[in-house]
Amino acid sequence: MTNSFQNSRRDLRERAFQALFNIEMGAELLAASQFAYGYDKVTGEDAQVLELPIFLLSLVMGVNNHKEELDNLISTHLKKGWSLERLTLTDKTLLRLGLFEIKYFDETPDRVALNEIIEVAKKYSDETSAKFINGLLSQYVSEAPSANKS
């Protein structure tokens, strides 16, 4: 499958989401990342293992390593009566991924990271969830003391 979209940052964010979702289902981090990156690229029995892009690994490992902190941040921005446990796994994973990129990737402007995760949300969730994710992450961006507003 030849596709100029593959390996774009948007594509890699989507693959990071897929890997993180699989990790939540019990998959090992590296195996989940390799599968998410290569499932549509590797064919045949003698296919070589693909080198994972740094951006993809940074997202997956970063979210995995900061999961508790990210969950606490998400919880503090939920409306009264809501808890992390009430969120779907899809929405939780998208929020963690978006929040991680906003918080830790200085080279990505906050609004770009926000818009990109909304596009992934529209693909893997519904419009209501995309609006919810937009609202929560927008609130975080507007309140963050050193927000990268570019």
UniProtKB/Swiss-Prot annotation:
GO MF, one annotated term: RNA binding
Q: Name one GO biological process term.
A: DNA-templated transcription termination
Q: Which function does this protein serve?
A: Involved in transcription antitermination. Required for transcription of ribosomal RNA (rRNA) genes. Binds specifically to the boxA antiterminator sequence of the ribosomal RNA (rrn) operons.
The Swiss-Prot or TrEMBL record describes its family as follows:
Belongs to the NusB family.
Q: What Pfam families would the database entry show?
A: NusB
Source organism, top-level taxon:
Bacteria
Listed SUPFAM superfamilies = NusB-like
Instruction: Please give the GO cellular component terms listed in this UniProt entry.
Output: cytosol
Q: Which UniProt keywords apply?
A: RNA-binding, Transcription, Transcription antitermination, Transcription regulation
Cystines in this chain: none
Query: What is the organism field in this record?
Result: Streptococcus pyogenes serotype M4 (strain MGAS10750)
Under the heading InterPro entries, the entry gives: NusB-like_sf (IPR035926), NusB_fam (IPR011605), NusB_RsmB_TIM44 (IPR006027)
Q: What is this protein called?
A: Transcription antitermination protein NusB
Note the HAMAP family from the entry.
Answer: NusB (MF_00073)
Asked whether the UniProt record includes Disulfide bond among its keywords, one would answer no
